[in-house]
């Protein structure tokens, strides 16, 4: 592997550039495990590896909202530490990190569920988990550029002029997507459709905003199909742009309903 690291993004090259990029999990552990199995990964020594040398990448927002948040976090921590996986920062990942730092954050939008699971652990286990999460988070970045910058992975958004750069403004777009600076009645940022104007060279895979299906728009694709709302957990297999999905219908009882699609090629 060749790597050039610049502050909070990474440029990576591997002998074999084969990736399985997973959308927003949000605590849906059962669906994550089903998807990992369907992708052909095999468990060995506590980690999942692929017989063809494929690598897992998370677009972020692994926890919050679902019912098995710590299990999802633990899976990705192990995969990053020992399984050759990568995990770009999502806004929920960043919020949990700030919570662990001791910053004042609102226990809302699903974080309260993750914290409740943490609080149920014995103090020693809680502190060990905190340390493992923080070390893992600090080892990762806000966006990845892969395979000679052919492919980019980010959580919220990445404008063409930001590729290969980093700043506080770029950081905000990576976490939240492009916004107007205003907030809606629920306190969430009003979003702009940055993908509709994207004209960059890298193919950008992202999540954050729930989309009914993984539709390719201007060399971008949103693979958050709202599994935690009863939609789908999506994986994008690269190269080739093949989508594989697992349904999250059972989650409709706990969260607002959403819809998605089935396995597709794009």
Question: Model features per residue range: what roles?
Answer:
Residues 50-53, 65-145, 149, 160, ...:
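Active-site neighborhood of divalent metal-dependent phosphoester bond hydrolases
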Residues 27-30, 64-67, 93-97, 160-161, ...:
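Active-site environment of divalent metal-dependent phosphoester hydrolases
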Residues 152-170:
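Divalent-metal (often Zn2+) His-rich catalytic cores of metallo-beta-lactamase-fold enzymes
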Residues 2, 13-14, 172, 176-266:
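Acidic, His/Gly-rich catalytic cores of divalent-metal-dependent hydrolytic chemistry
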Residues 24, 61, 90-91, 114, ...:
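Divalent metal-coordination and catalytic microenvironments
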Residues 14-20, 145-152:
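Beta-strand-turn-beta hairpins that frame and shape the catalytic cleft
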Residues 21, 56-58, 87-88, 152, ...:
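Residue-level marker for buried hydrophobic side chains located in beta-strands
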Residues 1-73:
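N-terminal active-site segment of His-dependent metallophosphoesterases
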